[in-house]
Amino acid sequence: MKPAKEIRVGNIIMVDSKPMIVLRSDVNGSSRTGFTYKWKMKNLLTNTPMENVFRGDDKFDVVVLDKKPVTYSYFADPLYVFMDEEYNQYEIEEENLGDALHYLKDGMECEAVFYDGKAISVELPITIARQVVYSEPAVKGNTSGNVLKEAKIENAVEAHRHTVQVPLFVSQDDVIEIDTRTNEYKRVVRN
């Protein structure tokens, strides 16, 4: 068990018998009065956010999750099905995928995250390349400064088409690189 003062962003801990990932940590107090830690967390089983305040000496079990490389196979409403190298299939509920929904594409390789033997979510590669399926053309005269526009990118389920802010020179059918952690455009891979 670790005290709250040793827990870092990204650690997975047990809170009320539920696995929670720490998304943000704010420290308040002083050495005289004692420190408190305000954490923004997410329940890994239900994907619901939660905020709570803990004292520095509160203790938590740190959880180590298993991960396995998988390939996205298909969508069977409301489940997304992934397959590993041995052709085992893992079903993950839509709400547990979070922002990964925006980037999933048939045949995409990622890592399934397991808790207690059950696949609960996936981790995507940090950067991915996606084709722009729709983008407004650049407006003449609107090219000064760092002007951005929205571009819709391809993915497996059209209902989850996602937009990314891109520079004006990016056009429809371009393939762009995106950072999946921040949803930021990185560069054009292919015109």
Swiss-Prot record:
The keyword Protein biosynthesis appears for this protein: yes
**What InterPro entries does this protein's entry cite?**
Elong-fact-P_C (IPR015365), NA-bd_OB-fold (IPR012340), Rib_uL2_dom2 (IPR014722), Transl_elong_fac_P/YeiP (IPR020599), Transl_elong_KOW-like (IPR013185), Transl_elong_P/YeiP_cen (IPR001059), Transl_elongation_fac_P (IPR011768), Translation_prot_SH3-like_sf (IPR008991)
Its pathway, per UniProt, is:
Protein biosynthesis; polypeptide chain elongation
State where the protein is found: Cytoplasm
- CDD domains recorded: S1_EF-P_repeat_1
Which keywords does UniProt give here? Cytoplasm, Elongation factor, Protein biosynthesis
UniProt GO molecular function: translation elongation factor activity
Q: Indicate the family of this protein.
A: Belongs to the elongation factor P family.
Q: Which NCBIfam families match?
A: PRK00529.1 (NF001810)
Q: Can you name this protein?
A: Elongation factor P
